[in-house]
């Protein structure tokens, strides 16, 4: 691994000696969402790796049976008839190749053997001992088949770690200190992760239920667990059963919660990060080792995998200059700290009325807070903004609960201010599943009044040099009060507006009850023009036509005229119905549209010793690109985004250059961000909304989420 940028993508071919496949077809139409479940059961029953081609199931080899009867987990029986034998002449798409490849991995157990060997060898190194528990980092090998621009298949092979406690969900539920609703869990011995929808006691069900579950189970671990529950009445008295969102039911004894960084204590989080954020060279060597094991195990079955990584196709140029209100500009290479010290913001409000709240256990840091406020006032004064302190409140509290009780009357009295600055104590960490966070409470209560807040943790004031904290806070104060720290000098191509749109599902009691489309509209200078929240009954992950229509109505209201070029960034997949609605309203309002999907997770990685890799790209097709959007300033391996143009006229390279420019628009820190401003913070906004933190007014131009 040198200066060039490699990707964990490997050319893959399937050239079996025996090209005979047995083809089965259902006697009745199968619902689309059940097709993969049926395919999996065809593989289990025949023992032959299988892929699906439309409504046919192709088995790699000869099957003598004329009819297959497959029982799904819900008890439904699917009948397949043998159509005959066909000669395999190649895959028609990536999915077919991926399905067959994964079945061969299961058949040879090469993947399971690697994970088992790795865990045994490095168990001590990938186990984290917290204060009250042990945490295991379980290796996960992920495979996905993609297609290159040239038309050959590529194996995307990656290694990650799943964070989970040693205890099963059953143990945690027995202790009654864990709310499992909506958490992700993984069944032991099953390559699947799902979200918890419901939990109930096993004793509520009769023996017939357990017998049917045992018979329908397709994995040894779950079949054994159901068998034990069927035989042991005492076990059923205390056992919990868990229903996942996709309808699967499992005994809690074989489920392990999948933790996130938010679920970890600080010391746990740091230790986990040291392991998970693996040095790029080390990660690549491990991937190569896994690949060699795959090659050896699958060679005799006709699989040929190149040992060579694919290489980046080139490096995109982009407009990387920002400017201030006086026309001073700078090229952003690493960060914006020096520019922020000297720049003159675009001032929309030059006098800010501010309320100060200080929450502490003791008074000893109050002098430090006063010192910090003086520096903040002077800093903003030099920027042309007067900070006018309307009032101050000091709250001394020994616990989070006491602090909340004392905060309520203070917050209730606040009105007619532009911002509330809150110095906040960090009380002992709580379980986020069952306790409130003081930060959430403050943010939520002030947003009910449509007042933005700036929270400063008391511990940050213990730093000897407050300049870093001061700059960061000042930048956010500007953005939260409608003032603009800086703008883009220019951007590639002619664009009038960028629209970032995402959908989050709001859950109550484990059930999705409504969805919120979050829209952010930016002008060609990267300046936020408006955010807009629209809520409607949930229909999976899709945007409704009404939500899309609202975006166009808002664009017109904001003054974007017919003929305007509108570039839409969808955080995630654009569905066919969504594309049709965008095109319909684009024509209706007379806008020229570019529709892009931005996929931020589970993409191939770039590996390079070069620090400045922002702009490297790999084209999967004429309209699909893997794009490096930041330089190697962080630990760990670079995680690029995937950009796919779904509709429009501009070349995907121009659209990617625009994305690179929009990564400079970050008002919450000095570093450019991984995602363009259009979709950056989508995850945070969603999490805030799930915790009840959202503005009363669903439309505005204040970045309350910073």
Curated annotation (Swiss-Prot):
Coiled coil location: none
Temperature dependence: Optimum temperature is 55 degrees Celsius.
Name of the protein: Protein argonaute
Cofactor binding remark: Mg(2+) is the preferred cation for DNA-guided cleavage while Mn(2+) supports both DNA- and RNA-guided cleavage of an RNA target. Ca(2+), which is found in the structure, does not support cleavage. Cleavage probaby requires 2 divalent metal cations.
Role: A DNA-guided RNA endonuclease. Uses short ssDNA sequences as guides (gDNA) to bind complementary target strands, resulting in cleavage of the target RNA. The cleavage site is 10 nucleotides downstream of the residue base paired with the 5'-end of the gDNA. Binds ssDNA better than ssRNA, binds dsDNA and DNA-RNA hybrids but does not bind dsRNA. A 2 nucleotide 3'-overhang (possibly on the guide strand) may help load nucleic acids into the complex.
Active site residues per record: 502, 541, 571, 683
Practical use: Can be used for genome editing.
Gene name per UniProt: ago
Region annotation (PIWI domain) ranges: 449-706
Linker L1, as annotated region: 109-165
CDD domains: Piwi_piwi-like_ProArk (cd04659)
Entry similarity comment: Belongs to the argonaute family. Long pAgo subfamily.
